[in-house]
Amino acid sequence: QRGLIPREELKTFETLGTRLQGSVDSIWLPWVELTTGSLGQGLSVSLGIALGAKRLGNDIRSYCLLGDGETQEGNVWEAAMAAAKFEQDNLLAIVDWNGLQGGVTLEVMPSMEPYLPKWEAFGWHAIEVPGNDVEALLNAYHEARHVKGKPTVIVARTTKGKGVSYMENKVEWHSGKVTDELYEQAASEINARLEALSDYSVLK
């Protein structure tokens, strides 16, 4: 939509030797500020931004979107410990918990459940919401804004591919490729959902 990637180049996604890989690389994509993904570096970087902002007196919040599979990485929990230690109440992590990752379901991986108590044990304020419910998400953001003395995590229980009939809850669409016909179908279904949404633009 913004012309950063030529439409034809999109067809090279996850093809050997191209710059559009499953884990984005900031070396090859200059508009991507850093390389994150399933190695779990994102929360550490977001914590650094939050720490720096507080020390400089900047009244900003740092947000980090994590995948459920990503939180199997030790790096995430090291950052979680540090964030609680430094009482980073300007840090908000959102975990997209859809139960599917990199070609497998979470059921075949070491269990992360019970999940919320883990974050709470690390000193975080933890909220769980149905992640495909826009109003529930906005209410959780609103709650997080009023938490003092600790970081907040929102665990959003989502359905992967929600709103696209052939993608919903299908592990193969973790990194699947669409044809022109499937793209048009997905765009049509998503646009219909967007038109049906109420106005959730105001957060007090």
Predicted regions and their residues:
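A glycine-rich helix N-cap at a beta->alpha junction
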Residues: 5-12, 83-96, 120-124
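Acidic, glycine-rich active-site loops and adjacent beta-strand->loop/helix elements
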Residues: 16-19, 66-73, 97-101, 132-134, ...
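A short alpha/beta connector and helix-capping loop motif
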Residues: 73-98, 153-155
